[in-house]
Amino acid sequence: MAYRSCVVGFSSHSGCEVTPAGSSQPGTSGWGSCGLPGPGFSSRSLTSCRPAGVIPKVTVNPSLLVPLDLKVDPAVQQQKNQEKEEMKVLNDKFASLIGKVQALEQRNQLLETRWGFLQGQGSATFDLSHHYETFQGRLQEELRKVSQERGQLEASLLQVLEKVEEFRVRYEDEISKRTDLEFTFVQLKKDLDAECLRRTELETKLKGLQGFVELMRTVYEQELKDLTAQVKDVSVTVGLDSRCHIDLSGIVEEVKAQYDAIAARSLEEAEAYSRSQLEERAARSAEFGNSLQSSRCEIADLNVRIQKLRSQIVSVKSHCLKLEENIKVAEEQGELAFQDAKDKMAQLEAALQKAKQDMARQLREYQDLMNTKLALDIEIATYHKLMEGEESRMDLPSTTVVSAVQSRCRTTASKSGLSKTPSRKKKNRGGPVIKITEMSEKYLSQESEASE
């Protein structure tokens, strides 16, 4: 049984050899070496082996063309299967390497695109000072506005406090005036009560005097009546001198006139005194009533003014409380805005630091990928040059030398029209070696004829 093994790889030598079954020594003649290009570098099949150049005429001994009884060696079949498995594994590895190379090329293109984009946006990405300055200016403007509002609020608060102090002074003055007026009112009330008591006493005295006058008048009239009756009823026998005449009626009239004059004068004096006292008390009462009315009016006015001042004080206090609350709210808002600005600035700095770290990491990754790409490009270029050199070497004409061999295996190989060349395997640094083994169709046909 004969098989052909082809060694394909990224090396400077590639060959295809034909080995007869059961042979232990490699032949020195064959079809010639055939080169198999690496994947992606040529359109020729991996399983094809074209003749190298023009084959010269070969002279063969006819005795060597006698068919032999050949049998298939199981070791060769096992070796062939093993080599096929190795070929599959190596082909899979080669395909995975090609996929990795393509993925790296795509990633390289993606990184180049990203690098170009980042270079295009480099100035916009790293030039954040303008944004910081704008944001800081806006915060300073807000802080300035808050400071102005705080100054205005403090000025208005001072004005309100001055007004409150003024109202407090006025309120204290009004309170002192009210206290004085209340004291005056109490004094006037006391005087009025005293005068009322005196008036009552005088009225009582007047009534007593009037009763006394009436009593005296009644007594006088009764005495006068009694005296008149006595005078009329008493008959006096007086021995008088006829020469002396006494006018008793005149005397009685005179006494009566005196009594009447005394009673009238007493009555007039009592009436005049009572009238004067009453007029005086009435004048004083009217004066006290007027002062009391004026005091009541003043007290009512003071009460109204006090109520107004109290309402104004309450409104001013509420306004002061509102202003204090507004100041506190403004301070809290300013502190919150300042803290928020600090937090945002810290976040921006953290984002900038993170962006710088990401950029540095991407640059390191890009540098690593560029190094990997450069190494792969160098390796691919080397493999490409090696394959081009191998293809150029394979395109040159080769000579075939056939010699007769005494061994049975070589005779069988010459009868079957097959020869082989020593398999050339050259280790390549970093490149996989793929060995392809195929059955010779011609040898299989001869083997079938021999079995028949």
Swiss-Prot record:
Residues 252-390 are annotated as: Coil 2. Residues 391-452 are annotated as: Tail. Residues 411-421, 443-452 have a biased composition (Polar residues). Residues 228-251 are annotated as: Linker 12. The keyword ATP-binding does not apply. Keywords: Coiled coil, Intermediate filament, Keratin, Phosphoprotein. Residues 119-135 are annotated as: Linker 1. Residues 136-227 are annotated as: Coil 1B. Signal peptide: none annotated. Residues 82-118 are annotated as: Coil 1A. It comes from the Eukaryota. InterPro entries: IF_rod_dom (IPR039008), Keratin_2_head (IPR032444), Keratin_II (IPR003054). GO terms for cellular component: cytoplasm; keratin filament. The record marks 334 as: Stutter. Residues 411-452 are annotated as: Disordered. Belongs to the intermediate filament family. Heterotetramer of two type I and two type II keratins. This is Keratin, type II cytoskeletal 80. It comes from Rattus norvegicus (Rat). The lineage of its organism: Eukaryota, Metazoa, Chordata, Craniata, Vertebrata. The gene is Krt80.
